[in-house]
């Protein structure tokens, strides 16, 4: 029997719904979601990024509203433009501009983190190549990896910055008080040339990013460091750890 019902909400913003011709108001979503949950079904919410009238702020709003109704699962889809559709006509007329790939990743990343932090399982990010005929669109066959790799980079760098800042000042007393990240990395080299980036098997590829973009980024920005990559099965999905091999707690 049916145990999961997903709502193709697309957006909680009234203007986006109107401009996209969705034919419903946001209040219908809240009512429908409550009924689905009251009858014991598992609720899923589908959201689209980059519809007419959309913005980063509206995407964040939609993700926050999704958290309020507490679905178990969610899907995030960047808008694609297909020929012989009203959206394609708007694109041809210049009244609709598709998101760039970079913008689509940034907006989706913001939504992903809101949902993920709330414990909502994100079962799909982007479309499969078999789902569409790619046209003028932000479609990328590895869109989920682009998003999750970007999230991984942010989380890794935040931990790396904290690790480097915790080093004894005496190791680089000749340096100015306000040091750049690279200068701090050079200071770190004097004590230990290596740091370790770790994730579990499922999230391991996100350490490197799509086509190794994260590896390239860190190697370029922190040339004084040797970064090793570790698969750690004790870490939860989407959790990344940065540490020094000499760390007693490693």
Language-model features: locations:
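Conserved non-cysteine loop/helix-boundary elements of the Radical SAM core domain that shape
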Residues: 1-79, 83-103
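Auxiliary Fe-S-binding modules of radical SAM enzymes
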Residues: 86, 94-250
